[in-house]
Every structure is written in structure tokens, then in C-alpha cells.
């Protein structure tokens, strides 16, 4: 289910195709409006350019047990630079394609979606898609913190080539996905004629029993099954609420998983400018060669955070989708106001220790330990489409053996604009 293609060429073709559709537009007049970028629409069709620029600064001060392990890093980096298009051919078919450069690496795709809506409640989607996780489904443009922490690293899957069915009611939804690997991954190419890529199934259901103008309550449950096929074994490796890495691994099981099953819960409550949110995943891992290596372990990961808007805004919860969307700034600088300010504190937790405890033969050292971290966040929005962020993280990994523990003090800044 993997596709290798030129991002630039693909984007150009996509834009040309979408523009040709817009010109046709069934010979109807097209209305124009500005929604962060030019948008053209009539009763049946819509076309819009989209994109984002996220520029980060990261400073890490890392202390490691034992000699020669301490270091400091300081980097400016392009977190995301994306361009794309989205639109609607008619009342039944829609599309989205967006990609660009992430973390200073080569070009790759993010959202690439074809959607078919047979009616208002049902959507059938095909492409590079996320299926579960409250913070995961919330765009990086709108997450309260700069990055999603260990939960986003291995507690839930990011974009995967998938076939997804969704049903949405007024305050509930159900999602089911059949999944492969990312659209950016190379095809599996083993010598065996029967070689195959990873396979996954994900189901999610959410319910918002409270959904008033000032109060929102979100609860959700999801289940994920994965089989690695002939790809590399699943590894459970996390970072310190950042997308930055200098190559140092603070905590990991290494590649151990042949298959796994994940049960996850989500919760969030919004009361005016105050909100609280958390998620937790319990991952049952089936080892490779368990008879030789050891029993099957459980991996646990979760987070919780609290946020508050002193300027009076509230987080924009979509009760039908079970996701958070773009916040509406009450007094943007474009209207002579001061913009919006959000303050937040977050706790992250990951426990990989069972991957070590269940080994038949235990090595003297292992990074399959525990991680805990606290993050303070400040978000300033001059408008709903521009954001400046500051995050400070104090994290600790408690691993096995000498010279394996880390204390991480991390400061990050971000300037962000999207359209």
C-alpha cells in the first residue's frame, strides 16, 4: 500500500487538476472568500490552497549517569513547511493533499485523502490518514503543546495508508480503519515471494454527553491491532515532548514486537477558558521468538494536561468529530485587540520496564525503563492563524544499569503561521 513519488511534481499535478475542476465547475459562478487563503466555492464545489510554516528553536541540557554522558544542544530548525490543496468535487466527493518538509529532512506527504460521503453522517476515506487518539487527531497547528510526547511517539499511530469508515452524529462518532504503512515508506522488498508489509486494524468510538456553549465533556475508547508482516519489529521508543533528536535515545524497548494489541482511553473537559485533557494506552506486545527471548510484555504510556486562557477564549471542541479545532481569538491584533494567551502544564508518563522484566536472560544494562516529564507551555495568538509558543520540559528516564539514566532540561520556541 506504499507510494513513492516526487512531492513537488505531485503537488503541481494536484493543483493543475484542482484548478481544471474549478474552471469546469459545471459552468456555475464561483464565490470567493478569504479563509486564511483564497477559497472558491458554489453550492456544489469548493477549492482552497492550504499550507503552514513552523519554525522552532530547541535547547537541551542533558545529564547522564556516569562519565562522559552530559551534553548540551542548541538548534534552529524547520519543524514543518507544508503546501497543499483541498476541495470538493460535488456533494459526494472531496479531497485533500498536503506535504512538505519536516524536521529539516527530505520532502514527504502528510494528509493525502479521497473522501466519499453517501450521506451527511457517513464518510468513506482512502489515503494517508489518522484514525484514533484525541491529541493525535488534533492538528499540530492546534495542539496545546509544541509536540505530543511519548504518547504520540508510540501510544497511537500517525498517518498511515488506510481505508477508513466514519459515522458521525450530533455528539458522537464511530471510526473503523484498515491500515498499512505510511505513504512515505518504501515497499517491502524481501527475497521471499510471500513478503508483505505491516497490517493493522483500528476502531474508535467517542461520545460528548455534555455539549453546551460553555461546557464540553469528551470520552472515547479505541482499540488497535498490528502485525509487522515482513517489516522490522515494532519498537517502543519515546522522546521528551519534542520532535527534535540529536541521535541520543533516552528510553526504548528496541525492536521486540511481532504483533501488538492496544486499548486506549481518552478524556477531556472544557469549562469556558479552563480545560483538562488526558489519554492512556495499554499495549500488549507479542514478542518475536518468545520461547527463546522471554514472555510477552505490556507497555504503558499516557499524559494529562491542564490549560487556561487568561484572555477569555476557550478551546474549540468539535462534538461531532471528537476533535479539537482552530481556536477563535476574541480580540485579534487585526481588530485592534491584544490577541489571545493560553497557559498550560502537562505530565507525561511511559513505562517500558516490563520489556526488560520479562526477558529470560537479562542484560546488565537496558533502556527499557520508565520516563516521566513535566512541561510548562505558553501560547500567544495575535490572530487565529498565527501563533508563538514557548515550552519548558523537565524530564527523567530511569533505565537499567550503569550510565543509562538521563535528566533532560529542554526549552523550545516556535513561530507558526498557517493558511
Features from the language model and the residues they span:
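Gram-negative bacterial Sec-dependent N-terminal signal peptides
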Residues: 1-27
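Domain-scale selection of a single, long terminal region
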Residues: 2-9, 197-205, 211-230, 254-275, ...
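Juxtamembrane/membrane-water interface recognition
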Residues: 17-20, 59, 390
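Cleaved targeting-peptide boundary
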Residues: 27-34, 64
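Short, solvent-exposed secondary-structure boundary motifs
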Residues: 28-30, 74, 154, 254-258, ...
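Short solvent-exposed loop/turn micro-motifs enriched in small/polar/acidic residues
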Residues: 31-33, 106-107, 156-158, 258-260, ...
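Outer-membrane beta-barrel pore domains
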Residues: 70, 115, 233-419
Amino acid at each position: 500500500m506504499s507510494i513513492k513519488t516526487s512531492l513537488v511534481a505531485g503537488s503541481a499535478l494536484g493543483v493543475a487538476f484542482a484548478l481544471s475542476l474549478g474552471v469546469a465547475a459545471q459552468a456555475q459562478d464561483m464565490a470567493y472568500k478569504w479563509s486564511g487563503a483564497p477559497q472558491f466555492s458554489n453550492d456544489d464545489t469548493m477549492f482552497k490552497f492550504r499550507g503552514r510554516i513552523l519554525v522552532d528553536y530547541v535547547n537541551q541540557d542533558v545529564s547522564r549517569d556516569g562519565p562522559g554522558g552530559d551534553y548540551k544542544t542548541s538548534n534552529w530548525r524547520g519543524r514543518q513547511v507544508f503546501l497543499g490543496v483541498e476541495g470538493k468535487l460535488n456533494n459526494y466527493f472531496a479531497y485533500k493533499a498536503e506535504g512538505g518538509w519536516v524536521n529539516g529532512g527530505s520532502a514527504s506527504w502528510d494528509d493525502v485523502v479521497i473522501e466519499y460521503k453517501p450521506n451527511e453522517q457517513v464518510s468513506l476515506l482512502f489515503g494517508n490518514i489518522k484514525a484514533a487518539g484525541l491529541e493525535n487527531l488534533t492538528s499540530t497547528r492546534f495542539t496545546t503543546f509544541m509536540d505530543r510526547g511519548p504518547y504520540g511517539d508510540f501510544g497511537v499511530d500517525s498517518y498511515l495508508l488506510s481505508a477508513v469508515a466514519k459515522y458521525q452524529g450530533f455528539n458522537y462518532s464511530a471510526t473503523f480503519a484498515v491500515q498499512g504503512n505510511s505513504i512515505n515508506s518504501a515497499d517491502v522488498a524481501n527475497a521471499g515471494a510471500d513478503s508483505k508489509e505491516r497490517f493493522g486494524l483500528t476502531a474508535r468510538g467517542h461520545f460528548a454527553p455534555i455539549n453546551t456553549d460553555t461546557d464540553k465533556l469528551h470520552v472515547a475508547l479505541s482499540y488497535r491491532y498490528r502485525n509487522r508482516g515482513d517489516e522490522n519489529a515494532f519498537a517502543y521508543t519515546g522522546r521528551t515532548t519534542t520532535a527534535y533528536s540529536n541521535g541520543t535515545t533516552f528510553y526504548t524497548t528496541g525492536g521486540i514486537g511481532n504483533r501488538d494489541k492496544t486499548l486506549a482511553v481518552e478524556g477531556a473537559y472544557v469549562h469556558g477558558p479552563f480545560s483538562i485533557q488526558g489519554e492512556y494506552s495499554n499495549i500488549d506486545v507479542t514478542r518475536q521468538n518468545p520461547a527463546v527471548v522471554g514472555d510477552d510484555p505490556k507497555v504503558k504510556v499516557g499524559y494529562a494536561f491542564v490549560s487556561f486562557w487568561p484572555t477569555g477564549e476557550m478551546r474549540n471542541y468539535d462534538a461531532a468529530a471528537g476533535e479539537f479545532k482552530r481556536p477563535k481569538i476574541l480580540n485579534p491584533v487585526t481588530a485592534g485587540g491584544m490577541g489571545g494567551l493560553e497557559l498550560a502544564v502537562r505530565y507525561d508518563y511511559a513505562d517500558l520496564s516490563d520489556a526488560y522484566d520479562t526477558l529470560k536472560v537479562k542484560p546488565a544494562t537496558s533502556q527499557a525503563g520508565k520516563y516521566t516529564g513535566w512541561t510548562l507551555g505558553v501560547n500567544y495568538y495575535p490572530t487565529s492563524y498565527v501563533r508563538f509558543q514557548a515550552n519548558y520540559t523537565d524530564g527523567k528516564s530511569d533505565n537499567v544499569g550503569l550510565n543509562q539514566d538521563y535528566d533532560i532540561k529542554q526549552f523550545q520556541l516556535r513561530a507558526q503561521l498557517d493558511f
